[in-house]
C-alpha cells in the first residue's frame, strides 16, 4: 500500500517540501535560520492577532489601549513583549540569514535571492508601521521623520507625504491606515515566503562548500527537522529571558511618554534593527541624497549576484574575501552604534567613513579581491 503522504493531493506537497525533500548532507547550523524565521513569523502573526483584539487605532486611545493590554488582559504583558522582542529576534535571524547567503554565495540562485530582498523590504515596512502603533513619543516622531523623507522626491514629494499621512500631519488617519497595513503585510510576507521556498526547491539548497551536492543528498526529515528543533530551543532560550526579565532592554524609554506633537524628543531614532540604515541616511547632508543612500543600502543586495567575480561560489576557501566579509560585518556594527548616537563630532565623521566603507566594500573591494583570488588560483 502506498503511503498517504505520497498520494494525497495536499499532503504530497507538504511531503515534498518538508519530509522527503533532498538536502545536502553538509549543511551547517547557518542553514537553521530559514526555519527560525518561519517560527518567528508564526509567533508574530499569532501574538499580533491577539493584540489586535484589544488594540484601538485611535490617537485618543491607542496609548491607553496598549497600557490596558499590559495591565488588564490575561497575559497581555506577555503577548505585548513577545511581539516586540519577537520582532528583534526576527531581525537578528533575518540579518544572519542574509549574511549566510552572502558568505556562501547563495545569491547565485537569483530568483530566490530577489524574492528574499522583497521579503526584507516587506518585513522592514511591517516593523516600521508596528513601531508607530503604541503612539508614544518615539512612535509619533519616528513616523513623522521617516514618512517626511518621501518629500525629497522631486515634483510629487509633498503631495505623496500628505497622501500617506491622510492630512497635513501624522494624525488619526495615519495611525488607522498604519494599523490596517501592519495587520495585512504579514500575510503578504507569508505569501512571499511560499514563493521564496518554491524557487528554492526548484534549484535545491546551496551548501557550505559551494560545490554541487547532487551525489550526496539526505532527506530533510528526520535529519534536518531534528536540527531545526534544536535551533528553535536555542532561540527560545535566548528570547525567554529577554521577554521575562528585560522586556524593555531593546526599546526606547521615550515610547512610554504619550505622543505629543508640540514636544520634540532630543534624539529621534528608530528601533535598533534600522539603526545601520538610519546612520547611512544621516551621513549625507543632502535630503534626497540621504534617501537614495538609505534605499540603496538594502537594494545593493540585488546587484551582488552581478558583482560575483570569483570562480568559486562560497567564501569557504577564499581567505582574502573572508577578511573583507568580516570587515563588512564590523562596519555594519559601527553603523548600528552610530545610528543611536547624537549628530555631533566625532560621530558624524565616523558615520560618514563607515557609510563610504560599506558601499566601497560591496561595490569595489569584494569584486576586486575575487579577481585577485582567481589569479592566485593559477599559481
UniProtKB/Swiss-Prot annotation:
<feature type="binding site">
    <location>
        <position position="201"/>
    </location>
    <ligand>
        <name>a ubiquinone</name>
    </ligand>
</feature>
<dbReference type="InterPro" id="IPR005798">
    <property type="entry name" value="Cyt_b/b6_C"/>
</dbReference>
<dbReference type="GO" id="GO:0046872">
    <property type="term" value="F:metal ion binding"/>
</dbReference>
<keyword id="KW-0349">Heme</keyword>
<dbReference type="GO" id="GO:0005743">
    <property type="term" value="C:mitochondrial inner membrane"/>
</dbReference>
<feature type="transmembrane region" description="Helical">
    <location>
        <begin position="178"/>
        <end position="198"/>
    </location>
</feature>
<keyword id="KW-0679">Respiratory chain</keyword>
<dbReference type="InterPro" id="IPR036150">
    <property type="entry name" value="Cyt_b/b6_C_sf"/>
</dbReference>
<feature type="binding site" description="axial binding residue">
    <location>
        <position position="196"/>
    </location>
    <ligand>
        <name>heme b b566</name>
    </ligand>
</feature>
<keyword id="KW-0999">Mitochondrion inner membrane</keyword>
<comment type="function">
    <text>Component of the ubiquinol-cytochrome c reductase complex (complex III or cytochrome b-c1 complex) that is part of the mitochondrial respiratory chain. The b-c1 complex mediates electron transfer from ubiquinol to cytochrome c. Contributes to the generation of a proton gradient across the mitochondrial membrane that is then used for ATP synthesis.</text>
</comment>
<comment type="similarity">
    <text>Belongs to the cytochrome b family.</text>
</comment>
<dbReference type="InterPro" id="IPR005797">
    <property type="entry name" value="Cyt_b/b6_N"/>
</dbReference>
<dbReference type="InterPro" id="IPR016174">
    <property type="entry name" value="Di-haem_cyt_TM"/>
</dbReference>
<comment type="subunit">
    <text>The cytochrome bc1 complex contains 11 subunits: 3 respiratory subunits (MT-CYB, CYC1 and UQCRFS1), 2 core proteins (UQCRC1 and UQCRC2) and 6 low-molecular weight proteins (UQCRH/QCR6, UQCRB/QCR7, UQCRQ/QCR8, UQCR10/QCR9, UQCR11/QCR10 and a cleavage product of UQCRFS1). This cytochrome bc1 complex then forms a dimer.</text>
</comment>
<dbReference type="InterPro" id="IPR027387">
    <property type="entry name" value="Cytb/b6-like_sf"/>
</dbReference>
<dbReference type="InterPro" id="IPR048260">
    <property type="entry name" value="Cytochrome_b_C_euk/bac"/>
</dbReference>
<feature type="binding site" description="axial binding residue">
    <location>
        <position position="83"/>
    </location>
    <ligand>
        <name>heme b b562</name>
    </ligand>
</feature>
<feature type="transmembrane region" description="Helical">
    <location>
        <begin position="77"/>
        <end position="98"/>
    </location>
</feature>
<feature type="binding site" description="axial binding residue">
    <location>
        <position position="182"/>
    </location>
    <ligand>
        <name>heme b b562</name>
    </ligand>
</feature>
<keyword id="KW-0830">Ubiquinone</keyword>
<feature type="transmembrane region" description="Helical">
    <location>
        <begin position="113"/>
        <end position="133"/>
    </location>
</feature>
<keyword id="KW-0813">Transport</keyword>
<keyword id="KW-0472">Membrane</keyword>
<dbReference type="InterPro" id="IPR030689">
    <property type="entry name" value="Cytochrome_b"/>
</dbReference>
<dbReference type="GO" id="GO:0006122">
    <property type="term" value="P:mitochondrial electron transport, ubiquinol to cytochrome c"/>
</dbReference>
<feature type="transmembrane region" description="Helical">
    <location>
        <begin position="288"/>
        <end position="308"/>
    </location>
</feature>
<keyword id="KW-1133">Transmembrane helix</keyword>
<feature type="binding site" description="axial binding residue">
    <location>
        <position position="97"/>
    </location>
    <ligand>
        <name>heme b b566</name>
    </ligand>
</feature>
<keyword id="KW-0496">Mitochondrion</keyword>
<dbReference type="Pfam" id="PF00033">
    <property type="entry name" value="Cytochrome_B"/>
</dbReference>
<dbReference type="Pfam" id="PF00032">
    <property type="entry name" value="Cytochrom_B_C"/>
</dbReference>
<protein>
    <recommendedName>
        <fullName>Cytochrome b</fullName>
    </recommendedName>
</protein>
<feature type="transmembrane region" description="Helical">
    <location>
        <begin position="226"/>
        <end position="246"/>
    </location>
</feature>
<keyword id="KW-0479">Metal-binding</keyword>
<dbReference type="GO" id="GO:0008121">
    <property type="term" value="F:ubiquinol-cytochrome-c reductase activity"/>
</dbReference>
<feature type="transmembrane region" description="Helical">
    <location>
        <begin position="320"/>
        <end position="340"/>
    </location>
</feature>
<feature type="transmembrane region" description="Helical">
    <location>
        <begin position="347"/>
        <end position="367"/>
    </location>
</feature>
<feature type="transmembrane region" description="Helical">
    <location>
        <begin position="33"/>
        <end position="53"/>
    </location>
</feature>
<keyword id="KW-0249">Electron transport</keyword>
<keyword id="KW-0408">Iron</keyword>
<keyword id="KW-0812">Transmembrane</keyword>
Amino acid at each position: 500500500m502506498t503511503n498517504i503522504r505520497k498520494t494525497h493531493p495536499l499532503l504530497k506537497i507538504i511531503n515534498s517540501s518538508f519530509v522527503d525533500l533532498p538536502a545536502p548532507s553538509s549543511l551547517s547550523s547557518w542553514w537553521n535560520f530559514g526555519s527560525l524565521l518561519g517560527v518567528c513569523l508564526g509567533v508574530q502573526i499569532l501574538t499580533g492577532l491577539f493584540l489586535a483584539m484589544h488594540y484601538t487605532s485611535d490617537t485618543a486611545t491607542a496609548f491607553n489601549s496598549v497600557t490596558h493590554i499590559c495591565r488588564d488582559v490575561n497575559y497581555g504583558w506577555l503577548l505585548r513583549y513577545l511581539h516586540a522582542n519577537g520582532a528583534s529576534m526576527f531581525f537578528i535571524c533575518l540579518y544572519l540569514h542574509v549574511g549566510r547567503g552572502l558568505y556562501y554565495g547563495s545569491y547565485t540562485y537569483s530568483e530566490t535571492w530577489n524574492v528574499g530582498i522583497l521579503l526584507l523590504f516587506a518585513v522592514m515596512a511591517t516593523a516600521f508601521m508596528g513601531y508607530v502603533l503604541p503612539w508614544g513619543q518615539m512612535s509619533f516622531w519616528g513616523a513623522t521623520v521617516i514618512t517626511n523623507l518621501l518629500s525629497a522626491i522631486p515634483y510629487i514629494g509633498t503631495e505623496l507625504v500628505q497622501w500617506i499621512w491622510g492630512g497635513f500631519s501624522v494624525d488619526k488617519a495615519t495611525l488607522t491606515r498604519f494599523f490596517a497595513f501592519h495587520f495585512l503585510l504579514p500575510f503578504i510576507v507569508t505569501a512571499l515566503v511560499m514563493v521564496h521556498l518554491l524557487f528554492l526547491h526548484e534549484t535545491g539548497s546551496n551548501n557550505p562548500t559551494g560545490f554541487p551536492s547532487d551525489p550526496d543528498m539526505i532527506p530533510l526529515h528526520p535529519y534536518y527537522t531534528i536540527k531545526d528543533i534544536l535551533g528553535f530551543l536555542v532561540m527560545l532560550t535566548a528570547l525567554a529571558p529577554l521577554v521575562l526579565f528585560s522586556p524593555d532592554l531593546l526599546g526606547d524609554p521615550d515610547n512610554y511618554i504619550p505622543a505629543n506633537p508640540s514636544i520634540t524628543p532630543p534624539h529621534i531614532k528608530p528601533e535598533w534593527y534600522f539603526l545601520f540604515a538610519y546612520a547611512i541616511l544621516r551621513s549625507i547632508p543632502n535630503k534626497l541624497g540621504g534617501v537614495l543612500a538609505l534605499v540603496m543600502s538594502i537594494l545593493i543586495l540585488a546587484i551582488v549576484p552581478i558583482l560575483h567575480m570569483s570562480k568559486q561560489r562560497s567564501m569557504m576557501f577564499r581567505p582574502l574575501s573572508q577578511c573583507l566579509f568580516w570587515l563588512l560585518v564590523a562596519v555594519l556594527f559601527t553603523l548600528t552604534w552610530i545610528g543611536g548616537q547624537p549628530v555631533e563630532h566625532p560621530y558624524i565623521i565616523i558615520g560618514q567613513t563607515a557609510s563610504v566603507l560599506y558601499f566601497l566594500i560591496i561595490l569595489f573591494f569584494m569584486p576586486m579581491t575575487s579577481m585577485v583570488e582567481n589569479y592566485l588560483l593559477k599559481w
